From Swiss-Prot:
One Pfam family in the UniProt entry: UPF0227
Family to which this protein belongs: Belongs to the UPF0227 family.
Alphabetical list of PANTHER family matching this protein: ESTERASE YQIA-RELATED (PTHR35602), UPF0227 PROTEIN YCFP (PTHR35602:SF2)
Organism: Salmonella paratyphi B (strain ATCC BAA-1250 / SPB7)
InterPro entries: AB_hydrolase_fold, UPF0227, UPF0227/Esterase_YqiA
Source organism superkingdom: Bacteria
Gene3D superfamilies given in the database record: alpha/beta hydrolase
UniProt protein name: UPF0227 protein YcfP
Amino acid sequence: MIIYLHGFDSNSPGNHEKVLQLQFIDPDVRLVSYSTRHPKHDMQHLLKEVDKMLQLNVDERPLICGVGLGGYWAERIGFLCDIRQVVFNPNLFPYENMEGKIDRPEEYADIATKCVTNFREKNRDRCLVILSRHDEALDSQRSAQALHPYYEIVWDEEQTHKFKNISPHLQRIKAFKTLG
């Protein structure tokens, strides 16, 4: 089972395309939708939905995957639910760059301080990070600096922030999922 979390643009047709691409790894891909506008409520909702899916799950090696803001959530929810994560161009600093787009961007900073201390150290090697060199929305070098000490970084030379085509990375994701 692969759980897919969309980014800030929840209505993007690219979400459906990514789900279809992920089905080459596992036919059971589940899109979990969330508001993107209310961080604390989103966190509660995502934890509840992912936990529900895991309770009914038969896959011994489930995976959670997210793009952009979905990558922010996939890393945290995956850690809290003890499943491996794959994140594409994760928005690591939404409290800095979501101002004017969501109601309370400062809630992201609050969530970060309330999360498990040094959670990335405790999550070491359980997240695969795929970054675009041509991310027009986020500073991928800053993301790499923050994540490289803990996770493997794979660089993509073609895609932009929304990462429309993930197919060149499917074999690597499948291998990572298999490690479970």
